[in-house]
Amino acid sequence: IVIDVPCTVSKECWSACKKAVGTDRGKCMGKKCKCYP
């Protein structure tokens, strides 16, 4: 799932993904965070 959180590196997505989908598995893709529930 792609969330509307800007990023430059994947670790910036981990806490945002934790909030959004409940897991901290995420990557920065195309300047947005992609989370893996």
Swiss-Prot record:
Source domain of life: Eukaryota
Signal sequence segment: none
Residue numbers marked as site, Basic residue of the functional dyad: 27
Chief location: secreted
Annotated keywords: Calcium-activated potassium channel impairing toxin, Disulfide bond, Ion channel impairing toxin, Neurotoxin, Potassium channel impairing toxin, Secreted, Toxin, Voltage-gated potassium channel impairing toxin
Protein localization: Secreted
Tissue: Expressed by the venom gland.
Short name of one Pfam family: Toxin_2
Gene Ontology CC annotation, any one: extracellular region
Sample GO molecular function, one term: toxin activity
Annotated family: Belongs to the short scorpion toxin superfamily. Potassium channel inhibitor family. Alpha-KTx 01 subfamily.
Domain notes: Has the structural arrangement of an alpha-helix connected to antiparallel beta-sheets by disulfide bonds (CS-alpha/beta).
Function: Blocks high conductance calcium-activated potassium channels.
Protein name in UniProt: Potassium channel toxin alpha-KTx 1.18
